[in-house]
Amino acid sequence: MKIFGYYIIVLALLGVCVGVSAQTWIWYPGDMDIWTGNRINNLRTENGAFYPAFWRADSHCQTVEYQKTVELAEAEEVEIAAEGQYGIKIDNHGYVFGMPKKFTVPKGKHTIRIAVSNLVSPPALWLNGKTIKSDKTWTVSDYADATTTDTWYATDGQPLFDAAEKKPSAYHLPTSVVVPVKVEHGGNKIFAEFQREGIGYLQLNGVRGNGTVNIFYGESPAEARDGKHSYLKDRVTFTADSITDEQTLTVSARRGGDYSLVCSRAMRYVSVECQGDVSVEGVTLLSEMKDVEMRGTFECSDTLLNRIWQVGAYTLHLTDREVMIEGIKRDRWMWSGDAIQSYLMNYYSLWDTPVVKRTIWALRGKDPVRQHINTILDYTFYWFNSVYDYYLYTGDEEFVKQIYPRMQSLMTWYEGRLNGRGLVEGKKGDWVFVDWSPGKMSKSGELSFEQMVYLRSLEAMSLCAGIVGNKSDAAKYNEKAETLRKLLTPTFWNGKAFVHNVENGTPSATVTRYSNMFAVLYGYADAEQSISILNNVLLNDSIMSITTPYMQFYELEALCALGEQQRVMDKMRNYWGGMLKEGATTFWETYDPAEKYPQRLAMYGHPFGKSLCHAWGASPVYLIGKYYLGIRPTKAGYEEWECRPCLGDLKWMKGDVPTPGGNIHIEMHKKRIIIEATGCGTGTLIIGNKRTTIKPGVRQVVKF
C-alpha cells in the first residue's frame, strides 16, 4: 500500500495583498497561477490569427485530494462547492452518495477527504461550516508517491475569493467605459482616437443593417489606418438575427444595436470599415484594467521628470494584469527577463506583490525541466534572481519555502548543461539572448555576461536555501558561487574591462557594456575595476551603445551605483522625454531618436511590429525610487532600510515608496529633508558622511 504525500495548500492571491489567514477557495500550490499564465499566453493574435507562445506549457493537476482532520464537540453541517466533480469521504467509510451541496461531519475526531477532478481548470474547493472552512489548514495531494514529493507550506489568503459564487477560474479584470476624444466619419468608415493607450474590448455602438465590419487597431494613427499591415484586427459579420466574430468563430444572438468584441485589444487608435448595408454610429472602449492602488508617488520641481514618472507608472499599470506581461499589443506573454524588471518597478509603485508570485509560479511551470524558461538561457537565471528579490522587498519566507523545490530542480537541470570548464555556454536549442543589440554581437562560446547572471543565480540559491533551513544546499551553492567568482577576472578581464566572450579558449578583443555593467551592479568588480569600467566602457562612446530600455535599465542603474545620478537624470530627460515629445502616452519597446515616423514603428520585419506600451520601458519608476528618493531595503521586508536621496539639479522632490506594512515618505529640499516611515523597521538616512537613524512612525526633519 502506498502512502500518499500531502502538500499544504497554497491559497489564491489574485488582487491586492492583504495579510490575513482567511476562508477562501483553495487549490493545489501553483496550479491556478500556471493555468492563468497559460490562458494569458494564448491571448496573442497577429493579423487576425492565433499566435501561441512557443515554449512548453505545463498543466494543472487534473485530480487532487484535499484532507483535514478535525475534532468536533458536536456534529457540523458543511456547505461545499467545487470547480469540478467531487467526492466526499469521512474517515474510511466510503464516498458520500453523489455531489451534495451540504454534508455532515459527526461529533468527535474525523478525517475528511475530498477528491476533486477538473480537466479544464484547476480543481478548486470551497467549504463553509461553523468551524470547518476552506483555508490554509487543509492539505492537498496530487496522488504522487510520498517518496517523490516535497512539502509545501501555507500562505495567507485574501478576500477576493471569499464566497462560493466567486469561482477562481471565472476571475477577470474590472472594466470601465472610455469614450474617444476624437472621431472622424467618412463614407463607410470611422476613425477614432482615445486620449491615451489602453487595452480592452471595442464596443460598436448603433449598429444597423447587415454586412461585415472590419476593425483595425493601432498604437499609432498610421497603424490603425493601414488595414493591410495593422498588427491587430477583427472582423464581425452581422445578419438579421446573429453576430459572428470571424476571428474566434463566436456566434451570438443579435439583440439591440450595440456589440462588444469578444477579444481584448491594445489600442489608442481604431479604424472601423463597413461592408454591405451595415453601418456603425460610433465606438467606445470597454477598458480592462486592474483596480490596484498606485502606492508609490513622485513629484519634483521638474515637470518633465514628473511626466516621465507618471507615464512610466501608467505603462507598468497596463502590463500588470492577471500576470505581468511585457506588452499589451505584442506579445502579451510572460517573459522572465521583462518580468524581473516589472517586479522591481512594481516594488516602487503599485506594490502588487500577489502578481509577482503568480508570475514566478507561472514562468517556472512544473517538473521535469526540459528547456530554459522562455527557451532563453539568461531568462532562466533571471528567474532565480527574481525569487530572492521578492523576498528582499517583502520578507515573505513562506513563498520561498513553497517555490524552493522548483528552484532546486531547475538548478540541478541547468548544472548538467555547464561546459567542461564548469562555465555557461549556449547549447543546441538554447536561445542566448542578452539584448536586441544595434550591431553584431557574438553569442558563441563563454559569454562573460552569462557567467555574471549565472553567478548571481548561485548566490540566490544559497540565500534561499538558508531561508528554508537547508544548510547543505546553502553551503554547496555558496561554494560554487565563490569558485565561479574567482574565475571571472582571470578569464575575462583584459586590464581595462571584461571582454565579451571566450571562444575555444581564446578571449575576444570585443568589449560590450553588458557584463561590465552587471559586474558593477552585482559587486563582482572591485573599486579599481569599477572606475575602469566607468571610464573605459560606460562613458566610452566607441563601445556599442544600448538602444533598448530593457538593458538601459541596468546600464543606468550601474551608473547610479557609481554616483552618476546627474548623468542618468539627463539621460532620462533626453531618452524618455524624447518619447514624450513624439506623443507617447506609454513607453516603448525601443527608441532611436534618429528614426523617423512611421519607419520607427517597424520591428521584427513587420512595419508596425514595435510595441509602444512595453513594461521594460517604465524603468524610470524604479530608478527614481531607488536612486533619487534613494530608498531600498537592507534587511528582508524593510525590517531595516536605508535612504540615500539624491536631489541632483532639482530644487525639491518628494515621494512615497511602499513597504509591506506602510509607506516611506520623503521630502527633500536643498538644505532640509522631511522623512516618515510607517509599517516598517528602523531606517538609516545617509547624506554624505552623515547618518541619521529614522524611527518608524516618527516624522523627522533633518537639516544638512
Task: State the predicted function of each range.
Residues 341-350, 383-399, 453-471, 517-527, ...:
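Well-ordered alpha-helical scaffold segments within catalytic/enzyme domains
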Residues 530-538:
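Alpha-helical repeat scaffolds
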Residues 284-311, 317-318, 323-347, 351-358, ...:
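Active-site acid/base region of carbohydrate-active enzymes
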Residues 506-507, 538-546, 574-580:
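Solenoid-like repeat scaffolds
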Residues 1-23:
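Bacterial Sec-dependent N-terminal signal peptides
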Residues 153, 171, 486, 569-704:
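Non-catalytic C-terminal accessory modules of carbohydrate-active enzymes
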Residues 23-322, 338, 354-359, 398:
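Extracellular/oxidizing-compartment recognition motifs
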Residues 204, 396, 519, 555, ...:
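Hydrophobic, well-ordered secondary-structure elements that form the walls
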